[in-house]
């Protein structure tokens, strides 16, 4: 019996937990292999009160130790995930940017005008397409749009921009703009003051001032400041590329417009030269006709006044002669016959 007690051992977890107790006297009875150690099916009672007589206690202690180890392993992982999780602080609200409700409406670019006009048409035509896909399709359509069709949107954008500049210039002279400017300056000062107080203690203000004055070339890489600086530069470059592309498209459209105008001007110049030549020929023919009429009607004085034509008065002479004949054709039959003879001689 003493050999059995000495040979039986507890699981490692149980032995570690009860190592401070009297572990030398603890034995486990009722195990399956103990039955084979006794012959005849007889067993002797164990009178030691420190013995563990139920395997459920061993299992319970082992489960508790396992759960404790798992909990200790999960806590660092949860804490690590909590530290990795960034973003806006819980319970903190984002402040809306200060907007001036009295300011004139900002102008829209030609691309935005095209998007606003075509978006509803495309959504009505294909309602199953999601919004991001519609935006992508409209972007491709704008890039493939001919410069002549883009010209309409760009011209509208230019007119809208001129309107905005005029209204903004007038608005900046009003009292409402001055009040809004003071509010914006006060808010910016308060924001800078709060940021300075939250980032650095009072005794580090001089060091912070020196840090702000340093050049962008002194920013250490792989830092939050460097990443923010890179993001700002990338955003600025994207905006510059976009503006450059718009100006190139506008320049190409203007170049085509200039070429078409130059061609039209050259054509008009040729037409003007031709018309001048034709007018010169007609003027010469008119002078020849006046001279012939003056010579032919020199012997035909006007009834009542006796006026005969000259090179300077041939036009008025012919008008008066026509008026006299049309007024009384029966009384001026002889005059009509004379005029017919003169005209027949001119045709020959």
Swiss-Prot record:
SUPFAM superfamilies: HMG-box. Residues 34-47, 56-71 have a biased composition (Polar residues). It is found in: Nucleus. It comes from the Eukaryota. One of its GO terms (cellular component) is nucleus. The lineage of its organism: Eukaryota, Metazoa, Chordata, Craniata, Vertebrata. The keyword Methyltransferase does not apply. It comes from Gallus gallus. Residues 83-97 have a biased composition (Basic residues). PROSITE patterns: HMG_BOX_2 (PS50118). Residues 72-82, 183-213 have a biased composition (Basic and acidic residues). GO terms for biological process: regulation of gene expression. This is High mobility group protein 20A.
């Amino acid at each position: 019996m003493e050999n059995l007690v000495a040979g039986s051992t507890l699981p490692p977890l149980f032995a570690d937990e009860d190592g401070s107790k009297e572990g030398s006297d603890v034995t486990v009875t009722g195990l399956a292999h103990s039955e084979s150690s006794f012959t005849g099916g007889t067993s002797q009672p164990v009178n030691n009160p420190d013995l563990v007589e139920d395997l459920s206690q061993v299992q319970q202690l082992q489960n508790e130790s396992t759960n404790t180890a798992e909990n200790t392993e999960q806590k660092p992982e949860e804490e690590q995930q909590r530290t990795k999780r960034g973003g806006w602080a819980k319970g903190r609200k984002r402040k809306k940017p200060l907007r001036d409700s009295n300011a004139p409406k900002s102008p829209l670019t030609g691309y935005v005008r095209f998007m606003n006009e075509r978006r509803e048409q495309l959504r009505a035509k294909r309602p199953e397409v999601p919004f991001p896909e519609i935006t992508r399709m409209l972007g491709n359509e704008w890039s493939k749009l001919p410069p002549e069709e883009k010209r309409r949107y760009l011209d509208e954008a230019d007119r809208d921009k001129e309107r905005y500049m005029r209204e903004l210039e007038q608005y900046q002279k009003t009292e409402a703009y001055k009040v809004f400017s003071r509010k914006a300056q006060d808010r910016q000062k308060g924001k800078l003051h709060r940021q300075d107080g939250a980032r650095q203690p009072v005794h580090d203000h001089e060091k912070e001032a020196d840090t702000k004055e340093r050049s962008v070339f002194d920013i250490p890489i792989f830092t939050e400041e460097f990443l923010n600086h890179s993001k700002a530069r990338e955003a600025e470059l994207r905006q510059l590329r976009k503006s450059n592309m718009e100006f190139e498209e506008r320049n190409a459209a203007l170049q085509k417009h200039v070429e078409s105008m130059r061609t039209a001007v050259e054509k008009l110049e040729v037409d003007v030269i031709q018309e001048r030549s034709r007018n010169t020929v007609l003027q010469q023919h008119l002078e020849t006709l006046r001279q012939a009429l003056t010579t032919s009607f020199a012997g035909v004085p006007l009834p009542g006044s006796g006026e005969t034509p000259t090179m300077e008065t041939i036009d008025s002479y012919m008008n008066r002669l026509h008026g006299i004949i049309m007024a009384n054709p029966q009384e001026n039959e002889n005059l009509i016959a004379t005029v017919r003879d003169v005209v027949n001689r001119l045709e020959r």
